[in-house]
Amino acid sequence: MAGQELLVLYGSETGNAEEVAERIGREGNRRHFRVRVLALDAISPEHLASCSDGVIVVSTAGQGEAPASMRTFWPSLLRKSLPTSLLSNLSFALFGLGDSAYPRFNVAAKRLRKRLLQLSASELLPIGLGDDQHASGFHSALDPWLSSLWHSLRLKHPLPPSLHDPPPVSEGCMPPLDPPKLRVSRCGRCSRAESRRSRRSERLRASFVLDRVNQACNGIIPSSQTDSSIQSGVHSVHSAPLFRNCRLTSPSHWQDVRHISLDISQLPRSSIKHSHHKESEAPYEPGDLAAIMPEQAEDDVNAFLLRTSLDADELVLLAPSDNATVMLNGEASRLQHEPIRVEDLVAGCLDINGASPKRYFFEVLSHFAQSDIEQERLQFFASAEGREDLQLYNSREMRTVSEILYDFSTATPHLEYLLQVCIMLSFFCIDDV
């Protein structure tokens, strides 16, 4: 049946499960399914019960915990009050992402499968288990599992004679460029006086805005959608002097572990959670976390803007595009925010010289390459045949977005796609504060 609805859900910690879910969504759309891609925390067990076909991608966090975007859904699915026949209408396919170097390999996916079966759901095909220890990473198990998934779904929902499934993605046979999830509206350029506003706070505001828009794209209604709430989050971040940065591991050890100490004695007590403490007491308690905001070198940001032909002082507004997943209640996001400078968006949001991008980055980049040689190489990296070469070039050699863009100098993606396919800068936490 053409237009059969397919719900794709993910529980992600670092973004890998979300990346796989987005890939399944794109491939499903090309196969004439009506696809919605949502975080597991965007739905309830009762909503899942109303679905007939679901694909779920789940990673394992820490020592077997549920991933970040599943931590609300998982306890609700474990409620003893749920009837055992709740999911009798659901046929599901489940893929787990894990690392066999850990004792609880893919335990979150295995637990979820067990609970779904307890609630009378049925499996479309056997569970797939991706392993980061494989030479090609989790893609080595994912690619054949996806072939089985589409075969099973097509047997269940055959197409009419007038429609056909696309050929498998391979080198030299890339699908058309997918529409972007984000809509970027240009609204002029900022004045020289405006560009001298506090760069740190403006870049932090940009990261808050993009995070909320991405949540809206994935069906999660942000807890607060106004610019004033974003500004309150920005104002909760402070600068503190660094007075100790000592390496704990020996210089010959492969891992650089450091002891970092910050002086927070001058921070306003009202800005810290435990503000009831006396002035003579430390304004924190055992177990608190300090989240550190990364900053990128100005020269790196300027070089990236030059390479991508972006205007640093252009002002833009961000919103989910018409192609993004809508809210479960059918309403579009009403997130409102002041315009953001492109430079602040790049510097505050995109990890241009840190993390290596995902596989989809190379597929998108291939559509913008002006050189046949570069396009062929990018298509090869994005194909199943090129996954081991991609693993070596991208992950093991730790290529950054900036380095890849200079390697493929004729490919210049639009800002909408850069915001979608680049790895986002993220706060990192220091425990044992």
What is each residue range found by the language model?
Residues 1-433:
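FNR-like FAD-binding dehydrogenase module
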